[in-house]
């Protein structure tokens, strides 16, 4: 899980990754289009007056989009319960270290993991997420993603997620489609531990964080024994 902050106003797109022959994109997330915040300077007329009508039309569209995301229904009590329970567990083991923990990233990753598991494993994850049904986890994760998403040209806030599978593992297409549609997560397949697959992971991380964490990303790699890996980032 990776996060970074920047004044960069462009949003790293999920479909920027260009897969090479060494690995395959199984499913690709598409981020929603968002109304752009109007540039006031673009509405200044040659005579020095301001095009209030034109500006207001664009601004109203932006505000309607912004308000709709603000009003997304989220089970806040559920999220707060997860944050309280997980923060102590995550940070308690890192006492004395310069450690950053994003409950939102972990919530998204665990929600995705619940989609990829079954039986007792899924039940344990659902319990940790304070939910009884996978459908509720799915709805909550999608709501959280959209409530925190912004790419209006003035503010950038993007949660990116991905699933990395070993090319010798069978997968369920429906699950990957669900991850792409409801979690905005892309899925890839390749040879675990290979240089090309490791570089693909690093490239994806750099794209999703605007290249601000290249040093950290360069040290991340899969082991040959890895069957599946989840990667999440937050860019704001």
Predicted features along the sequence, with ranges:
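Flexible propeptides and autoinhibitory/regulatory segments associated with cysteine proteases
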Residues: 8-125
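Active-site-surrounding "flap" and adjacent substrate/cofactor-binding loops of secreted or lumenal enzymes
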Residues: 115-147
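Generic structural signal for hydrophobic core residues of well-folded globular domains
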Residues: 90, 112-117, 129, 148, ...
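Non-catalytic, conformational "gating/processing" segments within enzyme and secreted inhibitor domains
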Residues: 39, 96, 103-106, 134-236
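C-terminal motif of bacterial Sec signal peptides marking the signal peptidase cleavage site
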Residues: 2-3
């Amino acid at each position: 899980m990776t996060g970074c902050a920047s004044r960069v106003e462009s949003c790293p797109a999920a479909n920027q990754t260009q897969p090479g022959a060494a690995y395959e994109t199984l499913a690709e997330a598409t981020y929603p289009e968002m109304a752009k915040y109007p540039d006031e300077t673009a509405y200044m007329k040659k005579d020095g007056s301001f095009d209030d009508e034109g500006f207001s039309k664009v601004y109203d569209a932006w505000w309607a989009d912004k308000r709709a995301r603000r009003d997304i229904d989220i089970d806040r009590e559920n999220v707060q319960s997860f944050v309280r329970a997980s923060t102590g567990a995550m940070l308690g083991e890192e006492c004395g270290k310069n450690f950053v923990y994003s409950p939102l990233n972990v919530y998204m990753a665990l929600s995705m993991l619940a989609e990829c598991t079954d039986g007792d494993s899924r039940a344990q994850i659902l319990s940790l997420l304070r939910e009884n049904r996978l459908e509720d986890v799915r709805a909550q994760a999608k709501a959280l993603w959209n409530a925190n998403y912004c790419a209006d040209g003035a503010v950038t806030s993007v949660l990116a997620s991905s699933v990395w599978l070993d090319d010798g593992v069978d997968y369920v297409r429906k699950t990957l489609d669900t991850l792409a549609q409801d979690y905005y997560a892309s899925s890839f397949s390749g040879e675990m531990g290979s240089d090309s697959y490791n570089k693909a992971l690093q490239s994806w991380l750099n794209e999703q964080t605007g290249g601000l964490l290249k040093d950290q990303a360069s040290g991340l790699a899969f082991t040959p024994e890895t069957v599946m890996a989840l990667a999440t980032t937050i860019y704001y």
